[in-house]
Regions:
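Non-catalytic positions within long, well-ordered alpha-helices that form the structural scaffold/packing
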Residues: 28, 143-144, 297
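Conserved, mostly hydrophobic/aromatic
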Residues: 37, 76, 142, 153, ...
């Protein structure tokens, strides 16, 4: 099935009831299948975005009551939207009124240097069965009590390896815990979606536990994200030298079940927003943003986007402020959110874009050596259908560009990124 998720940082502007009223129609209009919520377990520091948890069995009271949160989940379900909860099983807030030195000793955390994370939080000790049981129960709460449809687990690379450093070796206790957790979740809620934020090369993260895998359903493709954003941030004249960045993901894509994520981490801390990372003038950024998302939605793998990406948001995310909805009065930003919705519609209605996406026989490069022209072309296949995807990443048009197919084919245009309906300000060769 197609899966396009919107990551949502519920930041205090709406309570759970208001969020249901405002958010769900937007999700439907833009063809999202799921909404992923940043951690809603209780936490004291707004600036942690929920990733420094103190109350693992408490829904934060910032946005309403537990019953109101359950109502939000039910409202999403009535409209066919799944809810994925962000869960933090690796580290917890160092606050004295929470789990840190809970009984005056290192009860939940390690008692050595590995007990402290890079964020100043405490790392869970997976070699204590009581701690593993605590975390498994906390994860199950979201599925059992609130009927969430899946869990995204944060900072898994910091669990798989000691301090997230492969040079320090594998943390076998953490690996065993994650296997047990995923096995238990899949046993009890087999239709749930369980995904890992993991930037390491650890093997079999998405392999079933019965095959000695860690048992996640999906793993964020951090390599695809970095290479894609690096390429589109490169000046046009220098792009021939890094042409391979947009090819590399398909060299390893079938090693795991990858999900393509442009998340909250990419639009904060001076990194700039997605559109603002792109090279060029305002007009060139606008044209390239359509191309980048064309590439994302036609590349194999499920999709995840942080809120605001669909607006072409220029200001970095600030948990103290709402999104710049005033952008919608500008032609490009209004047309881009409609373009984003059209990509979602195309993804949901063209089976070749999701059927067999983890089958290497369902993808084929057609043009992957056009370094100077900046052109890429590939086939997506599935459900008896074949879609040809062509992308020009340079700022010059190609009136003619030969492509050779191994079979006779007619052609129907499904999407043109430079069509007038998208409010184009600059003509480039269409994707």
């Amino acid at each position: 099935k197609p899966n396009a998720t919107r990551e949502d940082g519920s930041d205090g502007w709406y309570n759970y009831r208001e969020l249901a009223r405002e958010l769900i129609p937007w999700l439907l209009d833009h063809r999202f299948t799921h909404v992923e919520l940043l951690p809603l377990a209780e936490h004291p520091f707004d600036g942690s975005w929920g990733y420094q948890t103190t109350g693992y069995f408490s829904v934060t009271s910032r946005y309403g009551t537990p019953a109101q949160f359950a109502g939000f989940v039910n409202a999403c379900h009535r409209m066919g939207i799944g809810v994925i909860m962000d869960f933090v099983p690796v580290h917890f807030a160092a606050n004295a009124d929470a789990l840190a030195k809970f009984d005056g000793t290192y009860l939940y955390e390690y008692d050595s240097d590995v007990g402290q994370s890079e964020w100043g939080t405490c790392n869970f000790n997976y070699y204590r069965r009581e701690v593993c049981s605590f975390l498994s129960s906390a994860a199950g709460l979201w599925m059992d009590v609130y009927h969430c449809d899946g869990i995204r687990m944060d900072a898994i690379s910091r669990a798989l390896y000691w301090q997230g450093d492969p040079n320090r070796g594998v943390n076998q206790g953490a690996v065993n815990f994650l296997r047990s957790l995923n096995h238990g979740l899949n046993e009890r809620w087999p239709t749930g979606i369980y995904m890992a934020e993991d930037s390491t090369n650890f093997l079999k993260v998405t392999a079933p536990t019965r095959y000695e895998g860690v048992g996640f359903d999906y793993k964020w493709d951090m390599g695809w994200m970095h290479d894609t954003l690096d390429y589109f941030a490169t000046p046009f004249g220098e792009r021939p030298g890094c042409y391979g960045k947009l090819l590399f993901s398909m060299h390893y894509f079938y090693n795991e079940l990858y999900l393509l994520a442009l998340s909250h981490d990419e639009v904060v801390h001076g990194k700039k927003t997605i559109i603002d990372k792109l090279w060029g003038t305002y007009e060139e950024k606008c044209a390239q943003l359509r191309t980048l998302y064309f590439y994302m939605y036609t590349h194999p793998g499920k999709k995840l986007n942080f809120m605001g990406n669909e607006l072409g948001h220029f200001r970095e995310w600030d948990e103290k402020k709402e999104l710049d909805w005033g952008l919608m009065k500008y032609p490009f930003h209004d047309s881009f959110q409609k373009y984003f919705a059209e990509l979602g519609r195309l993804y949901a209605t063209e089976p070749a874009l999701y059927d067999g996406e983890y089958n290497p026989n369902c993808f084929e490069w057609i043009a992957c050596e056009s370094r100077d022209e900046g052109v890429y072309a590939w086939l997506r296949k599935g459900a008896g259908q074949t879609i040809l995807c062509v992308m020009n990443t340079q700022n010059t048009a190609h009136k003619k560009f030969p492509l050779y197919l191994s079979f006779p084919a007619g052609a129907e245009e499904l999407l043109n990124t430079e069509a007038p309906c998208w409010g184009c300000l600059l003509y480039t060769s269409p994707s």
